[in-house]
Swiss-Prot record:
Domain IV, binds dsDNA as annotated region, ranges: 331-453
GO MF: ATP binding; ATP hydrolysis activity; DNA replication origin binding; lipid binding
CDD domains registered for this protein in UniProt: AAA, Bac_DnaA_C
Pfam families linked to this entry: Bac_DnaA, Bac_DnaA_C, DnaA_N
Main subcellular location of this protein, as a coarse class: cytoplasm
Region of interest (Domain I, interacts with DnaA modulators), residue spans: 1-79
Gene: dnaA
GO biological process: DNA replication initiation; regulation of DNA replication
Residue sites binding ATP per the record: G156, G158, K159, T160
Protein name (Swiss-Prot/TrEMBL): Chromosomal replication initiator protein DnaA
Family listed: Belongs to the DnaA family.
Domain II: annotated segments: 79-111
């Protein structure tokens, strides 16, 4: 009987999906990971893969889908069964051997992957469609196209979600793949530890990072200024690339804007494809909230969703955090979620007019942060390229986004002559015409200075 039910399992799930109008996201999130573990005495034991769903979701699956599953099984098998659920991590030792990762690298990688960060739960919009398409292409054909894949964008916009999605997809398609996801901070810390224990660990460190199929390294900008880390990563990159292994990198800015990055690393980062993620527009923000509502099994009024999407515009993390805060306040006060409650929950996040006033100081703050300089250096007489170029970009943006005259901009930026400001603005305009991709840097900065609805 077990073999029959296993054979018919996909048919059972499809029947349930259609009969009870289960959405595609819920189907893939809660039902597809269920597997027939055992059948005995008219009881079917279904294993819940807690590496994908999470052990805390077991009660939800029981309450939501037990009766649906019993009905679907009876319809397809023509026999009544009771349903029990077991966590995959608690099943027999031999079952564990079959389902767990076959090597240390995979086990370690899985421990750092968020089970909810998959392509199925990633909301695609105009702000991220190229990054999503490139990530999926790399996941489907590692090291065949776009190597390396460089994903950049601001905090909380979905870079890490895409990287985890790539790792999950590759491991699902080929469980024997050696996939390693790390942050640049972890890479640096492990390098430091290997140097401290020079008798044993340098070889282990290199073996770990160079004997793999896919390397995903998050927030690469944090290796800036760390010469030894850049040196080690340079050789790691070369070894993997020459061996036709896939490399995926994320950062808060494109390679050409990481001014203190070694040129040899910058050029290698640009060998493949560079894609960006921008702040989501209103429609995408609504879709993100709807997806979170579904995944968290919530029921939220559309007016509340519209209120959040209209007022929280900066990034996905804050958007989802706002919804979580509203739901938490609702449970604490035992009140229904409505716009009045939402206003109370988000009063510290939303001012009556949350649109930023664009000032010269704000522009310089954003530009200096983007190019990893300080505001004092922008105002200073330092003429090195690492400082002068961001200064010229700040001048250009001040002219574009404020009503300040060239003379006023010059005075406020260290008593510079208006001709100096004009020269800086003209240089930036020429660079935009010469390198169209530079326009994207300007667009990113403008978004940071004053995000549009």
């Amino acid at each position: 009987m077990k073999s029959l039910i296993q054979e018919k399992w996909n048919e059972i799930l499809e029947f349930l999906k259609i009969e009870y109008n289960v959405t595609e996201v819920s189907y893939k999130t809660w039902l597809l990971p269920l597997k027939v573990y055992d059948v005995k005495d008219n009881v079917i034991k279904l294993s819940v893969d807690d590496t994908k769903i999470g052990a805390n979701s077991l009660d939800f699956i029981k309450n939501k889908y037990s009766q649906f599953l019993k009905t679907a099984i009876a319809e397809v098998i023509n026999q009544d069964f009771e349903i029990e659920f077991v966590l995959l991590s608690q099943t027999k030792a031999e079952e564990k051997v079959q389902t767990q990762a076959p090597n240390k690298i995979k086990n370690e990688s899985l421990s750092y992957l968020n089970p909810r960060y998959t392509f199925d739960t990633f909301v695609v919009g105009a702000n991220n469609n190229l990054a999503h398409a490139a990530s999926l292409a790399v996941a489907e054909s590692p090291a065949e196209i776009y190597n390396p894949l460089f994903i950049y964008g601001g905090v909380g916009l979905g870079k890490t979600h895409l990287m985890h999605s790539i790792a999950h997809y590759i491991l699902e398609q080929n469980p024997n793949s050696k996939v390693l996801y790390v942050t640049s901070e972890k890479f640096t810390n492990e390098l430091i530890e290997s140097i401290r224990n020079a008798d044993t660990t340098p070889t282990e460190f290199r073996e770990k990072y160079r004997n793999i199929d896919v390397l995903l390294i998050d927030d690469i900008q944090f290796i800036i200024g760390k010469e030894r880390t850049q040196e080690e990563f340079f050789h790691t990159f070369n070894t993997l690339h020459e061996s036709k292994k896939q490399i995926i990198i994320s950062s808060d800015k494109p390679p050409k804007d990481i001014l203190t990055l070694e040129e040899r690393l910058r050029s290698r980062f640009e060998w493949g494809l560079t894609v960006d993620i921008q702040s989501p527009d209103y429609e995408t923000r609504m879709a993100i909230l709807k997806k979170k509502e579904e995944l968290d099994c919530l029921t939220i009024d559309d007016e509340v969703m519209k209120y959040i999407a209209s007022n929280i515009k900066s990034n996905i993390r804050e958007l989802e955090g706002a919804l979580t805060k509203i739901v938490a306040l609702s449970r604490l006060k035992k009140k229904e979620v409505d716009v009045i409650l939402a206003e109370e929950a988000l009063k510290d996040l939303i001012s009556p007019d949350n649109k930023k006033t664009v000032t010269l100081d704000l522009i310089i703050e954003v530009v200096s942060e983007h190019f990893t300089t300080s505001t004092s250096e922008i105002y200073s007489d330092n003429r090195s390229r690492n400082i002068a170029y961001p200064r010229q970009i700040a001048m250009y943006l001040c002219r574009k986004l404020t009503s300040l005259s060239l003379t006023d901009i010059g005075k406020m930026m260290g008593n510079r002559d208006h001709s100096t400001v004009l020269h800086g603005c003209n240089k930036v305009e020429k660079d935009i015409k010469k390198d169209p991709s530079f326009q994207n840097t300007i667009d990113v900065l403008i978004k940071k200075i004053n995000p549009t609805p």
